[in-house]
Amino acid sequence: MAVRMGTAEQPACICDIGKMTDFHATRRLNWLGYGACAAAGCLWGAGFYFGKLALREMGVGHMVLYRFLFASLGMLPVLFVAGRPKGSPRWTNWTRRETGTLLLSSALGIPIQFLLQFEGLAHTTVSHAALMVGTMPVLLALGATLFAGERLDWIGWLALTGSTVGAALIVLGGGQAGIPGNVPTFAGDMLVVLSLVIALGWILMNKSLMQVHSPLAVTAYGILSGTVMLVLWVVAVNGPPPMEHVSLTAWMALAASGVLCTAATTLLWNWGIHHVPASRAGVFLNIEPALGSWLGVQLLGDKLGPFAWVGGGLILAAAVTLTARGHEADPEVLLE
């Protein structure tokens, strides 16, 4: 509906109320999207801390398995609404290609990524692992350059170089852990970085699936199918998970890491990047390394060496520089 406004002295203007309403609705979704990404970053920041608590009483495979069993419980209510478009009683059909992409994404993003990542955590400190995660925004930019045809300007390449140097300083800088017998190692740090490279494929494939299916559907089906793969692998390799002699602290840490740091964060992040440009939402990934390293220092007594502090600063500076700069909005995301 259009309304004519003006006087004889002042030219009239045509204001499309429908377009104004759409504009305000889009802006509200943008802010909600940014809020969802920020909340996901905060919850992700606690993931290594909860994981370290659980690793005191069980191995990596069983810890990751319990984490995703709890995450799957949190996703079950979502599953019943995820596959049905709004107002439709029928489930959305997935093509064979989309199903294959989902299964490959789930394999990369859950059993492969998390087993590698927490195997790395078992051989390094929470603070080191968290700071290594700070390289993720730069890896996202590099992945977009290599696989999505985007161009990385000189500032982007400078940020990539700074992030790489920062990671090297963290590895070489050493430090001490608050948990006796657990010190940062080169192998542990590199396993965390390798898991991030694998996570890049998971993120890019999820992004492509969300152009066709809802974030809820991609998240629910991805976590549940990945958990099935994880159960088969862990039980075959490590045997059944322990049930006895597990403390209440470990159970609470496992439940929190599954429901809050996995199910809730994935839902929040996937919904958030569906409504804002991923390039801008990436700045909230910086919350995870900052909060995670702080938790390691404050709650577990980790001590970072001077080179590690400098390296962490370089990583965070590179990530903020790359993600906080102005970008053109992605219309497919903003106008969905």
Q: What kind of region is each of these model predictions?
A:
Residues 75, 143, 152-175, 230, ...:
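Hydrophobic transmembrane alpha-helices of multi-pass small-molecule transport proteins
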Residues 3-66, 178-208, 228-232, 333-336:
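Glycine-/small-residue-enriched transmembrane alpha-helix faces in small-molecule transporters
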Residues 42-48, 76-133, 169, 257-276:
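Specific transmembrane alpha-helical segments of multi-pass solute transporters/efflux pumps
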Residues 31-36, 62-82, 104, 157-169, ...:
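Hydrophobic alpha-helical transmembrane segments of multi-pass integral membrane proteins
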Residues 41, 64-66, 128-135, 204-228, ...:
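Helix-helix packing/entry segments at the starts of transmembrane helices
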